[in-house]
């Protein structure tokens, strides 16, 4: 709330219905109105706008025409699969292979029209709803950018497009974001602005907390000592490919305080030390997952080689596209990644201790 007080103007409303009164269009309208007001200002000061949309987010109540475009129905799925609905993701599973600690979280069992279902029909319908919401947001962003161009300030403005997290919607048998697979940990990140070469891509290796120091450097503002992030301004300008060699992930909600991940190069380790969530005789779940993301970018598991799953995904995984943690051939790699993870946990002051962590 304190940060919000630093803005000269603030408009705050959250609505995930499919109307234009206070949904995505309302958010875009407020920014467009601000640009219109700036046209009349004689002594314009540099501006910063933070625009956060209500969608996409469950319940994914898309607009009727867009739902029809993506073969989806609201709120519940149709009686049979609509051929226009998006196909299931390549790493779809009908259930997660092991209890991972959050049996009652809303994202996993209370999403409107989904609940506990992970059928092909349900997931394809939910993907269609998600696409409908995303396209509506995309349209509203287009309106904002057009208004910025009309204001004459587009060429001198840095634009950051991103999100707070990804989402599963059927991937690995999950629905929400409370996991450390790539589909939920990674986020979209697109930047445009002066001296940023168009249509280029960089590895980056950044955290969202790196955005603040980057904005400070771009604006010529001294980066506060309290900021933990690293500016990736040189990455934006093509002078560097990345600012971090290691990425550390943690999730501590529900019954799973012990879910951590580490990434370096092509290798990624996810480590679970959680309770299974059972209300009678709960048990520990201790699992390692080791992936080579270059060879297995979708983090496919042995369960993805099930004939029933392949019949739905239409994808035949390669033999080595599995969790490699139990393979003796990769014992040394697992140990190196564990050592790196434990080192990073100590560096950031993570109080949790895994079963084999000294």
Q: Where do the model's predicted regions map?
A:
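Short, solvent-exposed turn/loop segments enriched in Gly/Ser/Thr/Pro and often Arg
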Residues: 1-2, 52-57, 161-167, 173-175, ...
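Active-site segment of extracytoplasmic enzymes that catalyze sulfate/phosphate-ester chemistry
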Residues: 1-13
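Active-site-proximal cap/lid insertion segments
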Residues: 11-21, 36-206, 218-226, 278, ...
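C-terminal cap/loop subdomain of S1 sulfatases and analogous C-terminal strand-loop tails that border
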Residues: 18, 39, 165-171, 197, ...
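Alpha-helical elements of Rossmann-like donor-binding domains used by nucleotide-donor carbohydrate transfer enzymes
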Residues: 26, 30-33, 143, 210, ...
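Residue-level signal for nonpolar/aromatic packing positions in well-ordered secondary structure
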Residues: 31, 77, 85-87, 141, ...
């Amino acid at each position: 709330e304190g940060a919000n007080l630093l803005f000269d103007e603030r408009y705050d409303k959250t609505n995930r219905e499919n109307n234009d009164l206070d949904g995505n269009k309302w958010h875009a309208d407020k920014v467009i109105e601000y640009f219109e007001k700036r046209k009349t200002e004689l002594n314009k000061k540099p501006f910063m706008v933070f625009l956060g949309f209500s969608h996409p987010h469950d319940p994914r109540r898309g607009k009727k025409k867009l739902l029809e475009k993506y073969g989806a129905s609201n709120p519940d799925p149709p009686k049979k699969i609509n051929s226009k609905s998006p196909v299931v993701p390549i790493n779809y599973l009908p259930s997660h292979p092991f209890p991972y600690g959050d049996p009652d979280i809303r994202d996993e069992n209370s999403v409107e029209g989904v609940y506990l279902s992970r059928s092909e029909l349900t997931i394809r319908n939910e993907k269609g709803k998600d696409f409908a919401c995303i396209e509506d947001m995309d349209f509203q962003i287009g309106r904002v950018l057009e208004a910025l161009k009309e204001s004459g300030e587009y060429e001198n403005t840095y634009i950051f497009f991103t999100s707070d997290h990804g989402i599963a919607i059927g991937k690995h048998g999950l629905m929400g974001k409370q996991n450390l697979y790539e589909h939920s940990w990674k986020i979209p990140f697109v930047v445009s602005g002066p001296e940023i070469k168009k249509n280029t891509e960089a590895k980056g290796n950044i955290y969202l907390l790196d955005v603040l120091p980057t904005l400070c450097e771009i604006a010529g503002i001294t980066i506060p000592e309290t900021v933990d992030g690293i500016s990736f301004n040189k990455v934006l300008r093509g002078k560097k490919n990345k600012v971090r060699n290691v990425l550390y992930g943690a999730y501590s909600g529900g019954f799973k305080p012990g879910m951590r991940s580490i990434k370096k190069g092509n290798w990624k380790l996810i480590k679970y030390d959680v309770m299974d969530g059972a209300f009678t005789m709960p048990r520990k779940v201790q699992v390692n997952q080791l992936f080579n993301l270059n060879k297995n970018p979708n983090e496919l598991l042995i369960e993805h080689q099930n004939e029933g799953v392949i019949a739905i995904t239409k994808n035949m995984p390669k033999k080595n596209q599995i969790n490699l943690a139990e393979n003796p051939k990769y014992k040394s790699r697992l140990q190196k990644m564990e050592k790196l993870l434990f080192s990073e946990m100590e560096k950031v002051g993570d109080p949790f201790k895994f079963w084999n962590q000294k």
